[in-house]
Amino acid sequence: MKFQEGVFLVVIFFLAYTQLVKGQHQPREDCKLKCGNVTIEYPFGISTGCYYPGDDNFNLTCVVEEKLLLFGIIQVTNISHSGHVSVLFERFSECYEQKNETNGTALGYQLGSSFSLSSNNKFTLVGCNALSLLSTFGKQNYSTGCLSLCNSQPEANGRCNGVGCCTTEDFSVPFDSDTFQFGSVRLRNQVNNSLDLFNTSVYQFNPCTYAFLVEDGKFNFDSSKDLKNLRNVTRFPVALDWSIGNQTCEQAGSTRICGKNSSCYNSTTRNGYICKCNEGYDGNPYRSEGCKDIDECISDTHNCSDPKTCRNRDGGFDCKCPSGYDLNSSMSCTRPEYKRTRIFLVIIIGVLVLLLAAICIQHATKQRKYTKLRRQFFEQNGGGMLIQRLSGAGLSNIDFKIFTEEGMKEATNGYDESRILGQGGQGTVYKGILPDNTIVAIKKARLADSRQVDQFIHEVLVLSQINHRNVVKILGCCLETEVPLLVYEFITNGTLFDHLHGSIFDSSLTWEHRLRIAIEVAGTLAYLHSSASIPIIHRDIKTANILLDENLTAKVADFGASKLIPMDKEQLTTMVQGTLGYLDPEYYTTGLLNEKSDVYSFGVVLMELLSGQKALCFERPQASKHLVSYFVSATEENRLHEIIDDQVLNEDNLKEIQEAARIAAECTRLMGEERPRMKEVAAKLEALRVEKTKHKWSDQYPEENEHLIGGHILSAQGETSSSIGYDSIKNVAILDIETGR
């Protein structure tokens, strides 16, 4: 009796020990499962307790650039728990000057004891008159290579057949080889030991030879590109085989780490074993519960003729027929003949009843579905968020209307293409006519993803908080559609871009018009930066976002990229967004956004107003593609007359244009801290207009001008003054800006 109890205790202890050993091989629950785009599968891991503890070769490194490294140097691109891992190996290259040779050193790798080269690789040489060699070292050394010959540019046929490119057809390294090296050499003349074969014509199209390992099917030779510089590719994908330990399945015995519903297989390329899920299971076989049952009935991997007869079971499936049916040899369920007629009648009656019921409830169901869909779109498009933010910002009482989907369709004639006013990065703008014949502009977002929805809600909130005569007025929005719609006032005269560069308008903007437009835009930006309840940076100021009404009054539009700056901050770090040609270079390189970014963009707009040329034009010469550099260079070299638009330049306004050009140059200085604030820019431009008006008035009434300006004005202290200072004009302009509209 005592003997039997002892045997029982030994068995219990053995089972408990076995489970304990297996449990110690399982990773922690908090292990990192991804590095960049690579999923990390156990037994691999990137920290203690996350990889197989019996072998440090499975300890990977995730560097700052989100790259996964093997042995700390080899980048991993994919891990498969079937015993394969994809990595990137460097190429070997050796370049030659004409008639001279540059000696290179073979490139070598030493893999860990758990890894070896897969036979699913090719050893490839690209070059003319060269020989490549790959050698592996282990219990049995192995070498392979190939020869490539050519004295002229090979035909571009995509073949790697020994002319400009060669590859090993049978790549099978010896068992348990984990160290290898490879390289290439140029063929020499056996008579004088020179590189005569490498003549001038070959040097022109093949200055270098390249030897590299690459996974089969991952490289296609192109003689027109690869012989020159291998398309600048320096690393190639290579397949490695891996296994657990250095024992066979039988030798490892109960210490194997194969989980439940998996089997152990001896490695075919080196010592050790791998685990695979049993048939009917899928998952990671190295986890204790990693192999999960595959539901063949759902995954459609069964052979039952009717999916309804499929019944899933653990590790497989069965085809079972319902009561009254028999399973035939083709795995189909059939019913005896005498029962078919009765079933047919029952089916017909049932179908008629269902059709009648469907007709009765169709209308109600359709209405319910339509209402639910509109409600779903409303929430999906941020309706709840918009109402909450409008209320939280104290904007619930503004004249802001929520439009219906039907109203938007009628207003745009079903979103007819003829109603499209313009298209941009944030969406499409349609011309709409409301039931009261009010003409509006309707902006339809391009995509209905979360980022676009946030930008849409952001634009609504920004526009709702701006009350300025030179900012496009928001009227409302529609959130019942798949993509959100924004409704704002319709500006009849197109954009400033159309008037300066487009063919839609036969426009001839005078200097007075252009100066006034510049003053209005500058004043608007100064208001947004300094006088709005929360400072706002537009972030996309350009002529295409400045609308003109019938009186050529400027209206700043498209606030989809704008940013609200907290009162306690002067700048924000954001993802760079804007339009090339107008984008602040300092913001582009640092990601730091502040009001000086709008100042730069406005400076480009002012240059367009002065020159009549586009901010970025690839049709201009290389030195003048970017208007800013072209304009600043002309200003500094006293060549301003070459770039100023002929429609605005004359002797009467030359000084004004020179001053405006100087302001534009100041706005586009490379360093943001050297640019003026928008308030200062607006004041300077306003001073230009005041000075222009003063000169015009003095020319018309010279006697009065002499009396007021040339004479003396009595001061409060009894002294006299004979001039009106620029600072006084500037102060008046600043006061006008800060007051707002």
Curated annotation (Swiss-Prot):
Positions carrying Phosphotyrosine: 488, 587
Active site as annotated: 540
EC number: 2.7.11.-
Catalytic activity: L-seryl-[protein] + ATP = O-phospho-L-seryl-[protein] + ADP + H(+); L-threonyl-[protein] + ATP = O-phospho-L-threonyl-[protein] + ADP + H(+)
Boundaries of every Protein kinase domain copy: 415-698
Up-regulation conditions: Induced by INA.
Disulfide bonds: 249-264, 258-275, 277-291, 297-310, 304-319, 321-333
A Gene Ontology biological process term: cell surface receptor signaling pathway
Expressing tissues: Predominantly expressed in green tissues such as stems and leaves.
Residue stretches making up the EGF-like domain: 245-292, 293-334
Recorded topology in the membrane: Single-pass type I membrane protein
Phosphothreonine modification, residue list: 404, 574, 579
Domain of life where this protein originates: Eukaryota
Subcellular location: Membrane
Chain ranges passing through the membrane: 343-363
Signal peptide limits: 1-23
Pfam families given in the database record: EGF_CA (PF07645), GUB_WAK_bind (PF13947), PK_Tyr_Ser-Thr (PF07714)
Residue spans, topological domain Cytoplasmic: 364-741
Family: Belongs to the protein kinase superfamily. Ser/Thr protein kinase family.
Protein name (database record): Wall-associated receptor kinase 3
Organism of derivation: Arabidopsis thaliana (Mouse-ear cress)
Lineage: Eukaryota, Viridiplantae, Streptophyta, Embryophyta, Tracheophyta
